Amino acid sequence: MPGATSAVGAGPVSGTVRGQRSTASPRRSADPGDAVVEWFDSHCHLQGAYLSGAGDEAGGGAPGSTAVGPGDTSGPDGAPPGGHALAGVLARAAEAGVTRLVCVGTDASTSLGAIELVRSLRSPGSAARAEGVDAWATVGLHPHDASAGVAATIGVLEEALAADDLVVAVGECGLDYHYDHSPRPAQREAFAAQVALAHQFGLALVVHTREAWDDTLDVLRSEGVPERTVVHCFTGGPGEARRCLDLGAVLSFSGVVTFKNAADVREAAALCPMDRMLVETDSPFLAPVPHRGSANEPSRVPLVGAVVAECQGVDRELLATTTTANARQFFGV
């Protein structure tokens, strides 16, 4: 398939550049060492109810994760154990050197909310502008919500993709056989439709998978793997990593890589070529150690990056520089 062997760091990514590049100067990282480095949170949820902290903690596991337990929220169907005000989130992100982020949609409402949030963050006088943080949006239908009118939702997403250049990817989308909140045929239908949207608009694809590796990769093969495809919140082991990499996908590592029971994820991080990886928080879910169980936020990307750097056997400054360049190229920003 076209571009299947293309790596994020191996030359220009084809497709239209969407949005504007940030001119912000990197702040100091909050990570040990405190060197001036710049980080890119490639996957977070900062819109609407995600930051409110309303509702009960669902417990048990975040999207895509096989290495979670009590105290970690379950993703789009659960609320964080405490909300953080957006202005404070942005200030802490900037202080930690996180100057770019992608706000991810999971259904029609949160996708439109991501666009609205990013547009407001880019407006003159916004907290993000004041802090030097730049942001982009994605639109997608999470497998948990795949039974809620796939055709109508895909239509809304398609309109948003056509109308707004702040949207840099389709997703998150994929298959979740752990919770099975939607029938599996509906999940596969929604996933295939969004792969088609990524091809139609020449955009990146953000993939969610949990306990569904075979079917996820089968859908990608049958629909054609978009040239820029990332398996977000990667929670597989070396075998799953190799299968994804062989398809031309990029792996994005989250706070799961810091968990004591995620040795297989660290093995995957060790073998993944550094130009084929991104780092993310999946905020407000999956806070890294030592904050596990609390509401997560982009400022904690350096904690994820520090562990991935250790797995790679490189210093965190190189990991930060490389993954930031990877993310900018991957999303075309």
Language-model region placement:
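Mid-domain alpha/beta scaffold segments of enzyme catalytic cores
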Residues: 1-333
